[in-house]
Curated annotation (Swiss-Prot):
Protein name: Ferredoxin--NADP reductase 2
Catalytic activity reported: 2 reduced [2Fe-2S]-[ferredoxin] + NADP(+) + H(+) = 2 oxidized [2Fe-2S]-[ferredoxin] + NADPH
Family of this protein: Belongs to the ferredoxin--NADP reductase type 2 family.
Pfam families per record: Pyr_redox_2 (PF07992)
Enzyme class per UniProt: oxidoreductase
Subunit structure: Homodimer.
The EC number(s) this enzyme carries: 1.18.1.2
Location of region: Disordered: 1-23
An example Gene Ontology molecular-function term: NADP binding
Amino acid sequence: MDLSIPNPVADTTKQVDGGSPAGGQPQEIDALIVGAGPVGLFQVFELGLLEIKAHVIDSLKVVGGQCVELYPDKPIYDIPAVPICTGQELTDNLLKQIEPFEPTFHLGQEVAVVERREDGRFFVETSLGTRFITKTIFIAAGVGSFQPRTLKVEGIDKFDGKQLFYRVKDPSRFHGRNLVIIGGGDSALDWTLDLVGKAESVVMIHRRDGFRAAPASVAKMKELCEQMEMQFLVGQVGGYEEKDGVLTEIKVTGADGVTRRLPVDDLLVFFGLSPKLGPIAEWGLDLERKQIKVDTEKFETNIPGIFAVGDINTYPGKKKLILSGFHEAALAAFGAAPYIFPEKKIHMQYTTTSPKLHKILGVDSPVFD
């Protein structure tokens, strides 16, 4: 089956973290994981126990997927034997867990081309021109790549990354600045509360007086408004003013129909992230409502050698839980082993008792009296 994508995106960016440089000879590998979220990271672990080294691709420039993008500091309560952890802590622990297997990460790029070869392996090329020939592919891309929903004001995009931001990477960058924060969800409220008292001024704007955020955060924001520590306006941004290429004001039309001009140094917009399945939709996989259909024995797709785990897959009884994705990753690893070691019989071993697994993990085998 030909799985090529028309008009693949590629440039001459040199890849320095493994794989081939753009336009170079593809690297031959055993397993390629698409998605560096928690399930993708645990897929590295399960493959590693079977002595299968993995390469991992993610469209984001950081590891962790939506756990890190959407709720790095939010508590997670349903990871077995971990009563509470944040998205960032979960990611950090998974990275620690997979250290013995030395996975190679290729971040800030998407899979642009997948072609089935006559020998059963797959040719893969990313949007940065990194190339592989791989025996297996594991799609652990959550609900796809995340792109921020942007502010729909003509021409304002030219300030993107300069004075217009959809993510906060370095909070200190906004200290002492006049900020306008737009949005009504947790991210907008969280950053508003964090930056009040650190920024020169903070004005929060939302199109209505209702919020999709924690009630305690909303109450705290209103308390700060009463204390004159910040302002809140109901309205929508419809325009802006600039001087010498610098954003100086935004125009906000309120519920009363009056347009107000607000001075601004930086504009932070939190409209949420829009999941996009992206090129995966063109791979020839069986899809159901933008999710990939799999069997429940190996979590393999309709294309032999391509597996799907985590929120991106669907099957009867599917539950979108991190722990479900971990289970799927374990079975997918065993399902993939025959493609990688066709002559090898895979025996079930346990990390508690197997000297072989202890050696793989780099730990001492316990001595029992």
